[in-house]
């Protein structure tokens, strides 16, 4: 029988090797699932299928896992390396019978009694043939395990490129044997748990059935909230209810997605081609966090940072290839143009107007539509920044969508809602040239198909893309911990806890995104070159600085979630030089090579530096304090950092608490000492003159931020009772003057929003009295610190400008 079975497998292997693509999930199961290949592995398949077994074997061999068709030799016994959990239609009866599976697992368990060093890993693994969830009108979904061989051949031809092999977290049979014993009841219990696991896994990969769009519209238009909004619309505009209802339908049609599975498959092909054309690869980290939430039945809300229009496509593509359901995406109405709007809508996009304040009908319909998506179990994605960042930094969160998400949790507390912040990064952003023009005052060009094609056509070799899933926030857990009264309150936004809770969650999302920063070659090279006032360094200096950055990130990482490049400094520099449109010029003289940024490229490179500015801002602050003092007690460094930190924390969404700050400052000092950038004699910190150039370049990351703080603090010291609007305007005006006189290229340096945020931070940290007048005694503490770490030249420019402002006011 075994020879016939082997012949059958060999026969199947030939067409399957051509028809079915290797798509293991995760892509590196040994590393991502922490599998120990020095210990035996047994693969658990959900049902009897020689076709699935052959595909699993093909994927196992491609990722370095043991061959499932070979046996495990243990304690003088030869046991199969795979078992089938359940029956399925097949030509040959084999070890797939359920009773045989239980016996095999029981034998593995018994071996752990006689072999104390044995730890067999039971790895559940299944094949996903296509990912269509079906539609609501369908009576039942096709069960692929019930397909006969001819049907599966047809499925392989149609879905072969969309077949995924899903490896799950291993179960340690050593643990099971030690904790629960080795009899048949334990094997049966494992089988029952595995059945539930495979069912959940299938649901997490396909999601709930796709809605009948018209039926959903009819249901929503009959909801009490929308009926009331229609009645109010008819009354306020003096129109008939029927006309108001038609307007409501029109709004709903404008908003709602129209997901089409075949459309997703076509989009997957196109996006695969697009990434290969534009980027050298997509680095995905921590997807297992999301897979775990999906298996546990969480409603998932993805909240990525917003760098580019391509973010919409990238995250859906990544999720699809990680075995997860592409989400419904809240997209700006500006993207609803032909033919992109139709394609996005079929891929899961639902469209939102930029503003709908005062439009009760629209806001009610949108809120009810979002709640319906949550109720039906669809994952959702929205960009909390509200728009793409033109500067490379995170923008202040817009809380409207988060408010609706928290309201949806209140209305339906059956399934937990988890927010998954996502860091999206690129070594080259498609629209970065456009951003630079807009920051110089050019009008924003309206999105259209021609613009998209022009951008894509002229770009290629843009380096790497990065998607890093940050630490999730389960809303009910967060609210229970920080706002326990949320469960007892009414369903209304005006509850005392509601707005503070929404703001706190939104802020935590931004913090978690920054904790998951993906640091790349462009970020590091741009940071180093922009730290030089001439935007130029010798090759030796640049490589030395890159090496310093890398060592710091290894020994004093900003967080456990950040992605750090493992290439050598030489490889990093070579990679950047090989990218297109970088604007990095290599010049040679008698002393060697110089690397210089073109002036026009400096603003563009600032974008990439700003992506990771939060990672280096604290070491930059510590370097500045030590450098400008020459020698200073460690405690004074910590005190100064504590005073400045609250403002940096709010501006750059830093994650350290006040207690954690002291510990991290100590780590920074230890690392600077290890690199011999500073000297430490007992508690006295001083400059190491032999390495002073590297320390000077470290300082630059915080220089412009501190200069902005100094501008606002100086104005407040001069005029404590100045109006907020005037303070913002004067701060911006002086910053513009400073940028011209001192050659500051950072586009956010004189951004009014940044000054507004700093003033708000001063207020929240107690630097204004109850009448809105600045408390000069407290401001003097900040000013004293800034006086010592800002160059005299810059101070004089600022003080002179503040003095002229005062003269104008008096005049």
Swiss-Prot record:
It comes from the Bacteria. It catalyses: sn-glycerol 3-phosphate + an acyl-CoA = a 1-acyl-sn-glycero-3-phosphate + CoA. Keywords: Acyltransferase, Cell inner membrane, Cell membrane, Lipid biosynthesis, Lipid metabolism, Membrane, Phospholipid biosynthesis, Phospholipid metabolism, Transferase. SMART domains: PlsC. One of its GO terms (cellular component) is plasma membrane. The keyword Glycosyltransferase does not apply. Its main location: membrane. It is a peripheral membrane protein. Pathway: Phospholipid metabolism; CDP-diacylglycerol biosynthesis; CDP-diacylglycerol from sn-glycerol 3-phosphate: step 1/3. It holds the Pfam family GPAT_C. SUPFAM superfamilies: Glycerol-3-phosphate (1)-acyltransferase. GO terms for biological process: CDP-diacylglycerol biosynthetic process; fatty acid metabolic process. Its EC number is 2.3.1.15. GO terms for molecular function: glycerol-3-phosphate O-acyltransferase activity. The HXXXXD motif is essential for acyltransferase activity and may constitute the binding site for the phosphate moiety of the glycerol-3-phosphate. Belongs to the GPAT/DAPAT family. PANTHER family: DIHYDROXYACETONE PHOSPHATE ACYLTRANSFERASE, GLYCEROL-3-PHOSPHATE ACYLTRANSFERASE. This is Glycerol-3-phosphate acyltransferase. The gene is plsB.
């Amino acid at each position: 029988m075994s020879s016939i079975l082997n012949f059958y497998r060999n026969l199947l292997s030939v067409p399957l090797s051509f028809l079915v693509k290797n798509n293991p999930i995760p892509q590196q199961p040994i590393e991502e699932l922490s599998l120990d290949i020095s210990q035996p592995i047994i693969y658990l398949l959900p049902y009897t299928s020689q076709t699935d077994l052959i595909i699993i074997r093909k994927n196992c061999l491609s990722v370095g896992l043991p061959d499932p068709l070979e046996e495990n030799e243990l304690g003088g016994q030869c046991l199969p390396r795979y078992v089938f959990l359940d029956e399925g239609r097949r030509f040959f009866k084999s070890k797939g019978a359920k009773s045989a599976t239980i016996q095999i697992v029981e034998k593995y368990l018994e071996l752990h009694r006689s072999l104390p060093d044995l730890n067999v890993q039971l790895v559940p693994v299944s094949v996903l043939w296509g990912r269509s969830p079906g539609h609501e009108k369908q009576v039942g979904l096709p069960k692929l395990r019930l397909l006969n061989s001819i049907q599966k051949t047809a499925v392989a031809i149609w879905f072969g490129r969309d077949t995924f092999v899903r490896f799950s977290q291993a179960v340690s049979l050593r643990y099971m044997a030690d904790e629960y014993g080795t009899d048949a009841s334990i094997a049966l219990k494992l089988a029952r748990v595995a059945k539930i696991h495979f069912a959940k896994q299938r649901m997490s990969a396909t999601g709930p059935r796709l809605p009948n769009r018209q039926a959903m519209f009819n249901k929503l238009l009959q909801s009490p909230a929308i009926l009331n909004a229609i009645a109010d619309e008819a009354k306020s505009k003096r129109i008939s209810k029927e006309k108001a209802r038609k307007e409501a339908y029109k709004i709903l049609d404008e908003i709602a997605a129209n997901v089409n599975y075949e459309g997703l498959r076509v989009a997957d092909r196109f996006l695969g081609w697009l990434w290969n054309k534009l980027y050298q690869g997509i680095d995905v980290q921590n997807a297992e966090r999301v897979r775990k939430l999906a298996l546990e039945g969480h409603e998932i809300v993805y909240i990525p940072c917003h760098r580019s229009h391509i973010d919409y496509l990238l995250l859906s593509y990544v999720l699809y290839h990680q075995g997860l359901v592409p989400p419904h995406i809240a997209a700006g109405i500006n993207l609803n143009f032909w033919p992109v709007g139709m394609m996005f809508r079929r891929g899961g996009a639902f469209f939102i107007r930029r503003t709908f304040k005062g439009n009760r009908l629209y806001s009610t319909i949108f809120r009810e539509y979002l709640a319906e998506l949550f109720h039906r179990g669809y994952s959702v994605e929205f960009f909390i920044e509200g728009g793409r960042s033109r500067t490379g930094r995170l923008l202040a969160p817009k809380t409207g969508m988060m408010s609706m998400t928290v309201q949806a949790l209140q209305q339906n507390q059956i399934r937990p809602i988890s927010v998954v912040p996502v860091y999206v990064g690129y070594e080259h952003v498609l629209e970065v040239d456009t951003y630079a023009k807009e920051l110089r005052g050019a009008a924003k060009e309206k999105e259209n198909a021609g613009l998209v094609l022009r951008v894509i056509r002229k770009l290629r070799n843009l380096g790497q893309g990065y998607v890093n899933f940050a630490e999730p926030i389960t809303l009910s857990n967060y609210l229970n911990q920080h706002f326990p009264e949320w469960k007892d309150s009414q369903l209304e936004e005006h509850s005392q806890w509601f707005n503070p809770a929404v703001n706190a969650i939104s802020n935590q999302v931004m913090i978690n995104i920054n904790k998951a920063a993906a640091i790349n070659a462009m970020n590091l090279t741009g940071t180093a070159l922009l730290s030089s006032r001439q935007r130029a360094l010798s090759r030796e200096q640049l490589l030395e600085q890159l090496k310093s950055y890398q060592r710091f990130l290894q020994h004093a990482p900003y967080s456990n979630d950040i992605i750090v490049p493992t290439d050598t400094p030489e490889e990093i520099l070579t990679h950047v030089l090989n990218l297109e449109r970088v604007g990095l010029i290599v010049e040679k003289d008698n002393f060697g090579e110089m690397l210089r940024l073109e002036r026009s490229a400096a603003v563009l490179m600032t974008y990439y530096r700003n992506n990771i500015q939060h990672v280096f801002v604290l070491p930059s602050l510590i370097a500045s304090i030590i450098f400008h003092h020459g020698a200073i007690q460690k405690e004074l460094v910590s005190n100064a950092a504590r005073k400045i930190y609250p403002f940096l924390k709010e501006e750059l969404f830093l994650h350290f608490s006040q207690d954690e700050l002291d510990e991290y400052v100590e780590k920074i000092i230890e690392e600077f000492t290890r690199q011999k950038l500073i000297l430490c004699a007992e508690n006295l910190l001083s400059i190491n003159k032999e390495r002073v150039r590297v320390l000077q370049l470290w300082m630059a990351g915080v220089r412009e931020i501190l200069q902005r703080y100094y501008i606002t603090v100086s104005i407040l010291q001069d005029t404590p009772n100045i109006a907020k609007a005037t303070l913002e305007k004067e701060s911006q005006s002086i910053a513009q003057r400073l940028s011209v006189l001192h050659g500051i290229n950072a586009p956010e340096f004189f951004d009014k929003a940044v000054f507004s945020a700093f003033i708000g931070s001063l207020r929240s940290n107690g630097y204004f009295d109850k009448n809105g007048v600045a408390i000069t005694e407290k401001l003097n503490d900040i000013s004293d610190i800034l006086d010592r770490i800002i160059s005299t030249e810059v101070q004089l420019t600022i003080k002179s400008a503040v003095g002229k402002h005062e003269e104008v006011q008096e005049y």
